[in-house]
């Protein structure tokens, strides 16, 4: 969530200024509208990440989405004033799809870690998203936009490697109900 939601929060806060400073002649309102495409992808992408996790597996889905996120940010690092603005917006929205879908994929894993602590684990995941945003925006205060995007891509690459060590949940987990009976829940 550090790399997914953290980068979303950071990018959403800097993207209008990035467009304004990168493309001559844009008004602040137009730059903001163009940048809103990044956040708009959330409506479709986040549920899609969760759905894909349920259908094809959590580890595989998270791996593909994190890799796509890293590639997307590498592409964003190449945007300059010579780019055609619609192409820059499309690249931004494509990157955003992987970011937002990755968030859904992260939360597909959360209830399988320790079912009785799902709320606490979800809260910790959310907190790490905020920590990611603070870290990325701190980096942005010292570097240019291109380097900022590359730092996010590099951190996503590290997360990609870490995901490869994740055990894919399989079989069933036991849930003890209030009456003392045990219910088995399929996790595949």
Residue ranges and their predicted role:
Residues 1-43:
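Extracytoplasmic gate region of multi-pass secondary transporters
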Residues 39-47, 130, 134:
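Residue-level signature of mid-helix packing/kink "hotspots" within the transmembrane helices
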Residues 45-57:
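Helix-to-loop junctions at the C-terminal end of transmembrane segments
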Residues 54-66:
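Cytoplasmic membrane-interface "Motif A"-like loop-to-helix N-cap segments
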Residues 67-82:
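C-terminal ends and interior cores of transmembrane alpha-helices
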Residues 101-114:
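Intracellular juxtamembrane helix-capping segments at the cytosolic ends
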Residues 116-144:
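A late C-terminal transmembrane helix in Major Facilitator Superfamily
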Residues 153-182:
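Multi-pass alpha-helical transporter architecture, strongest
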């Amino acid at each position: 969530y550090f790399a997914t939601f953290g980068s979303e929060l950071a990018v959403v806060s800097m993207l209008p200024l990035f467009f304004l400073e990168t493309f001559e002649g844009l008004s602040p309102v137009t730059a903001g509208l163009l940048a809103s495409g990044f956040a708009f992808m959330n409506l479709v992408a986040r549920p899609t990440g969760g759905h894909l996790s349920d259908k094809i597996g959590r580890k595989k889905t998270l791996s593909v989405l994190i890799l796509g996120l890293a590639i997307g940010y590498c592409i964003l690092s190449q945007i300059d004033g010579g780019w055609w603005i619609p192409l820059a917006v499309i690249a931004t929205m494509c990157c955003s799809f992987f970011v937002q879908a990755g968030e859904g994929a992260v939360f597909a894993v959360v209830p399988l870690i320790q079912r009785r602590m799902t709320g606490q684990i979800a809260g910790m995941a959310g907190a790490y998203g905020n920590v990611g945003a603070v870290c990325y925006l701190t980096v942005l205060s010292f570097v240019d936009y291109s380097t900022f995007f590359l730092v996010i891509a590099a951190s996503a690459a590290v997360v990609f490697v870490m995901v490869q060590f994740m055990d894919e949940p399989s079989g069933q987990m036991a849930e003890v109900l209030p009456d003392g009976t045990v219910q088995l829940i399929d996790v595949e």
